[in-house]
A protein has these predicted regions:
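Short helix N-cap motif at coil->helix boundaries in the Bergerat
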Residues: 201, 218
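Flexible, glycine/small-residue-enriched loop-and-beta-strand segment within the central core
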Residues: 51-58, 63-187, 212, 220-221
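A short, acidic, flexible beta-alpha connecting loop/helix-capping segment that sits on the rim
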Residues: 197, 213-215
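Conserved active-site beta-strand element of glycosyltransferases/polysaccharide synthases
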Residues: 209
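Extended, small-residue-rich solenoid/repeat segments and analogous flexible loops
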Residues: 1-51
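A generic "structured core" feature
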Residues: 175, 181-182, 188, 192-199, ...
Length: 222
């Protein structure tokens, strides 16, 4: 407990912003011992933050570009007053709240990858700058009783807070364009989601998708 609350944060705040190849090597040597599992040739640029890395499996040849935040669910998460709508994803095959990243993956700069509901990123996936992936977020009403007044921030303790838990899977070869937001579902193999799109549901294999909500407009590859 002391390690998680005091020692680890101190070490991470010190090594986080060391620039260049030296910083990458230091962060790799540190985090490969903190991840649940970790491959080789993992590059972690300056400013990257990992929250609950012990619930993350990281493959080989993975590059985390600067100033991204990757967070899994901590074991002590307080969900007591949360009304959680759980959205099923049949492609999701790891524990809720965990993150698994495959091989040959590039995570763009200023990404937010929030794995409270669970995220699987398969091999050869690319996320461009400022991509946001939220597998657990607040919801505008209670799915079981839409007449009930609910709230949308975790500081509310005396009333109900409505949430949605939506595990996310990015299949092999997926590319998310600049500023894409993913809020749920499975993105099919070799699909591309265009800049500024918002994805809230499944996307079939080999899709070229755009819009809010994002829809397939054509095949990516002929």
């Amino acid at each position: 407990m002391i390690l998680n609350k005091i020692v680890h944060p101190l070490i991470e705040s010190f090594i986080r912003n060391i620039s260049g190849g030296l910083g990458q090597r230091i962060r790799y040597q540190y985090y490969k011992r903190r991840f649940k599992s970790c491959g080789v040739n993992v590059k972690i640029d300056e400013g990257v933050i990992f929250q609950t890395p012990e619930n993350m499996d990281i493959g080989s040849n993975v590059w985390f570009l600067p100033f991204s935040i990757i967070s899994a669910r901590p074991s002590y998460t307080d969900l007591n007053n949360k009304l959680i709508y759980k959205k099923n994803n049949t492609s999701f095959d790891i524990n809720i709240g965990s993150i698994r990243i495959g091989n040959e993956v590039s995570i763009g700069a200023y990404n937010i990858i929030q794995g409270m509901g669970g995220i699987v990123i398969n091999d050869k996936v690319t996320t461009s700058a400022r991509v946001s992936i939220y597998s657990f977020s607040h919801y505008p009403f209670d799915k079981n009783d839409s007449t009930k007044v609910t709230y949308a921030n975790s500081m509310v303790k005396s009333k109900d807070v409505s949430c949605i838990e939506s595990p996310i899977v990015l299949m092999e070869g997926v590319w998310l364009g600049l500023n894409v937001t993913v809020l749920g579902g499975t993105v099919g193999k070799n699909s591309f989601v265009a800049t500024n799109s918002v994805l809230i549901d499944d996307l079939e294999e080999n899709s070229y998708a755009t819009g809010n909500p994002a829809k397939k407009i054509k095949d990516r590859f002929k």
